[in-house]
UniProtKB/Swiss-Prot annotation:
It comes from Danio rerio (Zebrafish). 3'-5' DNA helicase involved in repair of alkylated DNA. Promotes DNA unwinding to generate single-stranded substrate needed for alkbh3, enabling alkbh3 to process alkylated N3-methylcytosine (3mC) within double-stranded regions. Also involved in activation of the ribosome quality control (RQC) pathway, a pathway that degrades nascent peptide chains during problematic translation. Drives the splitting of stalled ribosomes. A motif (DEIH box) lies at residues 1015-1018. Residues 83-267, 898-1073 form the Helicase ATP-binding domain. The gene is ascc3. It is found in: Nucleus; Nucleus speckle; Cytoplasm, Cytosol. It catalyses: Couples ATP hydrolysis with the unwinding of duplex DNA by translocating in the 3'-5' direction; ATP + H2O = ADP + phosphate + H(+). Keywords: ATP-binding, Cytoplasm, DNA damage, DNA repair, Helicase, Hydrolase, Isomerase, Nucleotide-binding, Nucleus, Repeat. One of its GO terms (biological process) is rescue of stalled ribosome. InterPro entries: AAA+_ATPase, C2_domain_sf, DEAD/DEAH_box_helicase_dom, Hel308_SKI2-like, Helicase_ATP-bd, Helicase_C-like, P-loop_NTPase, Sec63-dom. ATP binds at residues 96-103, 911-918. Residues 576-849, 1374-1481 form the SEC63 domain. One of its GO terms (molecular function) is ATP binding. This is Activating signal cointegrator 1 complex subunit 3. GO terms for cellular component: cytosol; nuclear speck; nucleus.
Amino acid sequence: MVDVNDVIHANEKAQIDFAQMLLPEGIRRDNNKMYEEVEIPPNEPMPIGFEEKAVFVSELDEIGQLVFKGMKRLNRIQSIVFETAYNTNENLLICAPTGAGKTNIAMLTILHEIRQHLQPGGVIRKDQFKIVYVAPMKALAAEMTNYFSKRLEPLGIAVKELTGDMQLTKGEILRTQMLVTTPEKWDVVTRKSVGDVALSQVVRLLILDEVHLLHEDRGPVLESLVARTLRQVESTQSMIRILGLSATLPNYLDVATFLHVNPFIGLFYFDSRFRPVPLGQSFVGIKTTNKVQQLHDMEEVCYEKVLKQIKAGHQVMVFVHARNSTVRTAMSLIEMAKNRGELSFFQVDQGADYGQCEKQIQRSRNKQMREMFPDGFGIHHAGMLRQDRSLMESMFSRGYLKVLVCTATLAWGVNLPAHAVIIKGTNIYDAKRGTLVDLGILDVMQIFGRAGRPQFDKYGEGTIITTHDKLSHYLTLLTQQNPIESQFQQSLADNLNAEIALGTVTNVDEAVRWLSYTYLYVRMRANPLAYGINHKAYQMDPQLELYRKELVVESGRKLDKARMIRFDERTGYFASTDLGRTASHFYIKYNTIESFNELFNAQNTEADVLSIVSKAEEFEQIKVRVQEEDADGKSSVQILCGSHHTNAARIMRALFEMALRKRWPAMTYRLLNLCKVMDKRLWGWAHPLRQFNTLPASALARMEDKNLTIDKLRDMGKDEIGHMLHHVNIGLKVKQCVHQIPAILLESSIQPITRTVLRVRLSITPDFRWNDQVHGSVGEPWWLWVEDPINDHIYHSEYFLLQKKQVVSGEPQQVVFTIPIFEPMPSQYYIRAVSDRWLGSEAVCIINFQHLILPERHPPHTELLDLQPLPITALGNREYESLYKFTHYNPIQTQIFHTLYHTDTNVLLGAPTGSGKTIAAEMAIFRVFNMYPTSKVVYIAPLKALVRERIEDWKIRIEEKLGRKVVELTGDNTPDMRAIAQADLIVTTPEKWDGVSRSWQNRSYVQKVAILIIDEIHLLGEDRGPVLEVIVSRTNFISSHTSKTVRVVGLSTALANARDLADWLGIGQVGLFNFRPSVRPVPLEVHIQGFPGQHYCPRMATMNKPVFQAIRTHSPAKPVLIFVSSRRQTRLTALDLIAFLATEDDPKQWLHQDEREMTDIIATIRESNLKLTLAFGIGMHHAGLHERDRKTVEELFVNCKIQVLIATSTLAWGVNFPAHLVIVKGTEYYDGKTRRYVDYPITDVLQMMGRAGRPQFDDQGKAVILVHDIKKDFYKKFLYEPFPVESSLLSVLSDHLNAEIAAGTVTSKQDAMDYITWTYFFRRLVMNPSYYNLDDISHETINKYLSNLVERSLRDLECSYCMEIQQDEQTIEPLTYGRISSYYYLKHQTIRMFKERLKPELPVHELLAILSLPCSDYGTDTKTVLDNAIRICQAMLDVVANEGWLVSALSLCNLVQMIIQARWLHDSSLLTLPHIQKQELYVFRRWSSRGVRAGCGHQGPIEGLPELIAACDGKEDIFTSMVKEVLQPNQISQ
């Protein structure tokens, strides 16, 4: 075990142990009773080397000259470094004294980076890079931002400050090329996980100023930054150059190793001889130990030193360490000078504008300043007013002050040199440790850096006055004899947590590897004793693997105890928790989280919360002044919090997230309000209009006195408001502000899905006026949660953004989510929406459960009987048996065999994916072949891909081997009537069969159907469900008319409400088989992981590492299928996985094929990204791939040549190749119609999971589902218990009614009512009335509900010119447009749009505009558009013909031809030939018949197809000779 604290103390001891001290030559020592002084004279400057030559600005290229304008040449150090900094991409470490011009070296590297993105013509590609400059203090960051902004302005490079004081929006960051930030801020930014356009991904140059800070308390932040950057460079394989700038340090080689600097190229070390103004140093140690005497002696020595400089005619700065000491020291120096009669030395000669200065001083409110000025003394500290500080700076630089007494802030923030500086005393109070500590070496160096003014002085002088016991400490430090050590162990736990939350460290081994990138590791190997590692241990473990592991495990245990991570010591895996992520994102320390865990609970009041916040470790630096006489600093924090503190706002946000995650509604609400109180610096009880700074305070005070709430003000007129406030003109302004406070209206509706789950649809309508100056230009963020007031629990919460455009247009935003409900039923829940930024801006909506009717309980599943497996010989037909490769049916098939093969009853089979339902369908097909050989079988599959799969299989097995005709009927493939009439088996999609069977009276083959097999019938509940519903209803309707029964077989996954579906299909006890989800042939193990984050893309990016981990854990060598939502995600996921593989020992571990063979295959692939991923054994599969690429990928995966396949969700349905492990990466997809991310139907997720487990190879399958954390509970519930199927017919009822009216089956309103009673919708309406917005199920109510429904649908159709109601108000007459709509399978709204937009004489381009309207969502998917375009054009043609418009009709005929031939009307007809593009047409134009044997039909150049046909005269060799130079042989043969 390692105790970190012991190590830290050992570390400190080892650092101060200086037995042998080497001092430079020429020093002078003075030892008397009062003090000992060591004086080091200034160094001689370094002689100029033989090869050194100065670099002149005029020699630089154009960009360099622009930036260094006004400078003649670079100084000595800059010239030495120039070549490496300006012309290479090497990492650099520059150690040089303060004031040596390191900032310009940084500028050289910046210019090198900019030049790499310079395009011909002088354009800089600004979006391709970011430069980050990390400065140690905010004051310095501001100074650097100004400096770089001015210098880079000619190049148009934007420089912005990003610190705690200066926040930037996402847009500002994107528009900025250079960010100047502090270590802590950049740490926070890079801790947030990387999104798509992640900031850290485009950083190309990282500049770290003052790297010697590694020694200080803030060193660990720098270490974690560099480690994170270096690991990112390795994992993404993209270069980030690192430049370290530091003061001269002894162990510069260690720092160079840590920054990965090549010591022979990128390491430059300049000692004090390179200072622009040499520095003389003197160290004074006061001998007495009596504290009072010590102070007195220090002042005495200080006075002597000051007087000596003043007599020599120099100005002096005296640095002290507390604000009140500045005045005290100045007064005592004046006092001494008076007593000794030497005050005249300090007083300034009164020059010309002295009087002016005196006036300025006298105007100041600072009494001490006014009193001291005449004596030539000034003071300066951060507690003074800005103008007073500036006044002191200008007086000192103009020479009107001889002595300036100041604190160290002057040395850091302001560039104000003096000939001599004196540091009086080196004890400063450190609030964290609660004691006095030594002044940090960094401050000393910075202060000494102010000694000597470059233009005026030959040398500068720095004096440090300390106690005698500290004398040697400062001597060693300032003569650079102490190596700088790492402080990383102090905050190892916090930094480890940040890496785990980011996902870059997931187990102990990775954490050990991560530590090897830190400075701690470099120093532990160089100086093991200082870190508590003895000689023997170091010899046994020279790489310190074991020691690093001990450190990691101990930190892991600490974090696990604080519930910030879950640490499984057996496997060594780390998993981040919500608490750990919150701590990392809000930069909260481990100790603070521990105290929160102890103190924070749901019952805390506001006062308790403030008290908890004030106990945070972040506030230790707040000290209580003696005058305040309060022993406890914590109450001081509370008071300061009340007046505002940056840390408090951050910690408050973290507490808010914790409360939200713990699901405490009252606490969440309270904390969100406190967060806003901190941000706005307004108490919650103040009037909300105080958030506007445009209204006068008097008016606001009156509103508070008269209790004029926002609601009251909304209802009042502007004049009334003016009178109430005794200020007539202000009414309008107040009214405008009232309407700009964000307000929303909430409306909710609920649908019970089961007895325990409700779906809530929430409509959010903005109710305020947008003003860019008040609201910005993006949107207003809100928090939304559903709370149960009785149990004090949040059942659902989410963050949403009201976009500016939604507010301006007033369009409502729809949010859909599910919540649990418990019995006994509560009376109500509340939906609460609270603005994230505005006080007093919230809305509440009540969900009332009084009229809620929950659906019936579901009957039990079918038990799987313990039967002897049935051999396939039971089919009794040799031909059928020969189709199967197995000998016996599986248990499910055995149990259903008799019903399917020996009876004609309707069957509903509910069984998990992968249990052999297709073979069950074949049993029913064979029954028809046996019993009704002249009838037809129709097999309906929901997707074209499924139809294709069945066709490919059955064309061989049923058509070739059994001699039965199999026909495909889809949008892609419409055979002629004769083929359909002769077919025995028709495989089709729901829409196509619906379109065909609509006119069943005229199509004899529809009446010959003996069996309808519907695959995936549970899709009834999805968007395309209504079509299935209509098909079955129509089939029943047809068989009732033709008195010939049609058998219906439904295949589905396990269902919750199978009984309802069975009743509707007319199935009694015999035909219903609904097995449990658990009776899969291969058992399935499911893991569900939740991921936080409101935004989709960054959330997907955070899932990539867990995907990689899951593959390594569950399926290191077996096939893996990863499902994602879009083509883009297939690419991003694949590229990230390759990046993770790159860090492994064997990056091609997923490729199970000889690399040379794979190279040959890759050569045939068209898609560039796929070429890259296949080389690593990762395939991609989506609709955008070329057919041949897709086939290649499928073959490689099925034959286990590649191990991982990343596919879009359609593959789950379309292709049957299972894998050992299935990963569902995210359960939402982008829905173009509603323009937002919506959830996959649960059936899709089950289908994807169903692909896990290969029946012949695996004894169990694995599925890993990665979801948005707020949906985790929902998926937990429904992935294990089946999901009930509801009807979706309501939304599209009008279109289906129209089809029946056009077909003549519905001729009156009563027929329409009867038609509805045939549907599944009618069954479910009675079973789950609340789902369909029906309040009760009495006969009367249902009748009324249905007649309203019919009336509404018919009215819609009438408005669309599809039908008309006769005068008796009952009879319905179809119109031409209704028939067109039905025949071409178009929505009635589309036909209405055609009727209103088509005109007599429309040219083609306007027709295209009309055609594109219904398909605007398919901007990218040309294929989807083309599937529908011809059908829609033909419908338009019918509409135009019906109106008798010839010009438009001809235009449409041209348009259809253009679409089918894929060319414009005026293009050459030769383009209809495959593979011929415009650029290849020249081969035809230049052809002539000379040289070809006589008798050729065409002589000259060929312009079109008829000429080509004549020229070739049916001879292939003539055609080949024409095109052989532009086409490959295989292309010619096509």
